[in-house]
Regions:
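N-terminal basic, Ser/Thr-rich segments that initiate or prime the first beta/alpha elements at protein or domain
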Residues: 1-149
Length: 149
């Protein structure tokens, strides 16, 4: 089975989130430096480091994310530092949603959320899909779950 990759635009979302986090941490470090009348060299260096780590993580995260719908289950592989392989048996799927946050809409993406029997929340979210791909995946999983059940 060939695994499916996410849409490359998901990297934009992940990089922007990393940049926001880096700017918040760098701004806090800069604020402390200004308050203590210290040099801004360390906060600036930390901000650059956080940006580089965030961008690197987003790229590696994109490369590690894959999924495929098999005959009996949905298979996912993801993770940068900790690699996670998930298998969701089709007979356990209760319902499937397509979701588009405001940020996803800005870059033309959507997510598919798979809920399984006996869970309190969303068991699996597949981000970085085009709206059409998310809808197609939702319909396909729904049909396969009905057939499996």
């Amino acid at each position: 089975m060939a695994m499916n990759a996410l849409n490359p635009r998901i990297r934009v979302i992940w990089v922007v989130r990393s940049l926001i986090g880096a700017l918040i941490l760098g701004g806090a470090a800069g604020g402390i430096a200004v308050y203590r009348s210290a040099s801004l060299t360390i906060p600036a260096s930390l901000t650059v480091l956080f940006v580089a780590l965030g961008v690197g993580h987003a790229i590696l995260r994109y490369r590690s994310w894959q999924y495929v719908v098999g005959d009996d289950a949905l298979y996912l592989e993801r993770g940068v530092l900790t690699q996670v392989r998930t298998e969701v048996p089709l007979v356990r799927i209760q319902h499937v949603d397509s979701r588009r946050s405001a940020v996803e809409r800005l870059v033309g993406l959507a997510s598919t959320v798979v809920y399984t029997a006996g869970s309190r929340g969303a068991d699996v979210t597949i981000p970085g899909l085009t709206p059409d791909d998310a809808s197609d995946l939702r319909q396909r999983l729904k049909g396969l779950a009905i057939d499996a059940g």
